[in-house]
């Protein structure tokens, strides 16, 4: 029994890694083979590691923990927002402000400002402002919403994080590790798995691959919080696994940031 099948992974292109010249040797154990200059990820390992990550996230959610979804690259933005909202968790999908976690007290002040701006819009006080003043406040609100909208309800640090492409999100990963917050991540062949607590070997560039794996993490949160099994469990026959394996073989700094934000 597994929470994800090799067929799902293959169809989403999870097995495609980066070019062989762009790799991290530490990912060698997760690589199945090489095809036309591209590394092919071992999906049998991905299946097992998705399940390990799923169980860890489910238990964290069952214990009342908060999971922060992080993915700012274009291919991940929609999936991160949609799946985090679906499971009622927080997310960062635009820009990671340096110190977002390690200087969280300052971030909370910016979140409070965002909430304040949302509350005054449309009030009597708002109607007394000039058009120019209203425009300035709306511009300020839009910028805060863009960067902090996904965490404006987050009153304290998260208990766990799910990261898409830890190499790109290296500042976030550094802050998470400094704070001792466990990390679950989609780790492609050019990433360092040693920085991640729960590695999910997989393609972090394809939209379908990112969506599939992110949705499984969201399912784990929902199951943990509600006690409802939302996972699409699969009981695969050995012949099916062999067939899919064959298919796989043939497949081809906060202050500076805030100052910059205000200056824009």
Curated annotation (Swiss-Prot):
Keyword line: Ribonucleoprotein, Ribosomal protein
PROSITE patterns named among the record's database cross-references: RIBOSOMAL_S2_1
Pfam families, per database record: Ribosomal_S2
Coiled coil: none
Taxonomy, superkingdom: Bacteria
GO cellular component terms, A-Z: cytosolic small ribosomal subunit
CDD domains for the chain: RPS2
Species assigned in the record: Symbiobacterium thermophilum (strain DSM 24528 / JCM 14929 / IAM 14863 / T)
Region ranges (Disordered): 228-264
Bilayer-crossing regions: none
Family from the record: Belongs to the universal ribosomal protein uS2 family.
Biological process annotations from GO: translation
Biased composition range(s): Acidic residues: 234-264
Name of the protein in question: Small ribosomal subunit protein uS2
Entry-linked InterPro entries: Ribosomal_uS2, Ribosomal_uS2_bac/mit/plastid, Ribosomal_uS2_CS, Ribosomal_uS2_flav_dom_sf
GO molecular function terms noted in the UniProt entry: structural constituent of ribosome
Cross-referenced Gene3D superfamilies: Glucose-6-phosphate isomerase like protein, domain 1, Helix hairpin bin
